[in-house]
Amino acid sequence: MPRTLQRRPLLAAVGVLLASISSAAVATPVHDRPGNRLEALIEQPAAQAEAEAEQASARFCTADRQWCVRTAREGDDQASQLEIEHRLSGTEEPQTWFIPLDSADADATGTDQPWPFIVRLAPGVDAGQVPSDPQQAALENVLVGVQRSVTTMYSGGDAGASTLVLSRIRHMDDGIQIDPDVLTLPADGHAMIRACFGEQDSARRAGACHDEYSFHGVLTLDPAGQGMPVLRYATTATRFPVGASRLQDSQARGPLRKQDLRTQTDPTCSFQRVLRFDGGRYQPDTPLPECGEFTEL
């Protein structure tokens, strides 16, 4: 559900670019035809000590310092929020808004980090009501995100998964409207599962005593897009050894051969999609495949 919030100052106590979903590198912003821009955010290391004291992530900002984001916990160890700061020209204090995040899975260790990118929308392209106030209409709307990660330990192994959630921030006549979930995508995943429980297993598996799984997503801005930013999502999923499956008992497999001891790309979960804004959310041009074997704990 959209949230419309009145603008308020930040209180002192609150204190072609490839957008790898989990990391950012300094690069030239990517523009599309209407002028939407995908930019890498810059981590602000000077604020790290303050962030740790406040149970917050580092702050990530645009190069011009107009937009900054971070995640922070507020009392409850399981609850966190995404904080967005917007500094307008000629103002001393930034405006700040908060997006509450659902509690982490009680059976897993969870962390929330800002997505280290921002999509800055070109004037007039944002779908929906255009403010009648010319000053509000001239203000910049953006897409910001948070990467939500969970990890767990197994006997002789471990697993982790992260999800990207994008939110839209747009200026309205009566303040800021926050659409907290316009896109949710698997970002990264990994698992290492123990497969040997004795010397016989080790010999049968040619010494490869763990099954390993990996998933990685990349989100980019389509330079040829029109209107609201068109996004491209590309993933790579792999397994080791050849034929490993979390859906089957590894003990039921036959002996591994030397040629099986290599990383195998999964064709179903290595794919590309085009994402367009429709009905208040980003929708893929074709449905995403079921890839829980790579993207879930």
Map each language-model feature to its residues.
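N-terminal signal peptide c-region/cleavage motif recognized by signal peptidases
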Residues: 19-22
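A domain-level signal for the mature, folded cores of soluble proteins
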Residues: 51-52, 68-75, 84, 193, ...
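Bacterial N-terminal signal peptides that target proteins for export
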Residues: 2-14
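Acidic, small-residue rich beta-repeat scaffolds with periodic aromatic anchors
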Residues: 27-61, 158-161, 169-297
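Short consensus segments that form the blades of beta-propeller domains
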Residues: 70-76, 109, 153-160, 261-267
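Eukaryote-skewed repeat-based solenoidal scaffolds used as protein-protein interaction platforms
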Residues: 134-140, 144-165, 177-189
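Acidic/hydrophobic-patterned starts of short beta strands in beta-sheet-rich repeat architectures
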Residues: 63-71, 136-150, 224-236
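Short N-terminal edge-element motif at the start of the domain
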Residues: 72-152
